[in-house]
């Protein structure tokens, strides 16, 4: 009997999360796991041409071979650049007058 892989496929949209367990033959690829899970039918908004995929937080190509107990993840596009988001949080903290927000300013402007 050939070895089987236990794989989880997960995706989180803004309002719903899905974690789907599938069993695949040894040597299966990330693309095969996505197809077997049916997640692309459940979430038609997923576009694999633009959205990134990975295993346990590490980006992988669709033809990457999976290992037993891997978790395949489909990543949504970022709504805001992380650098811009952090800058906004610091500005908000500065406006509130917190010492924490002022520590990023030059010592002369404190």
Curated annotation (Swiss-Prot):
Residues 100-110 have a biased composition (Basic and acidic residues). It holds the Pfam family Ub-RnfH. Residues 86-110 are annotated as: Disordered. It comes from the Bacteria. Belongs to the UPF0125 (RnfH) family. HAMAP family: UPF0125_RnfH. NCBIfam families: PRK01777.1 (NF002490). This is Protein RnfH.
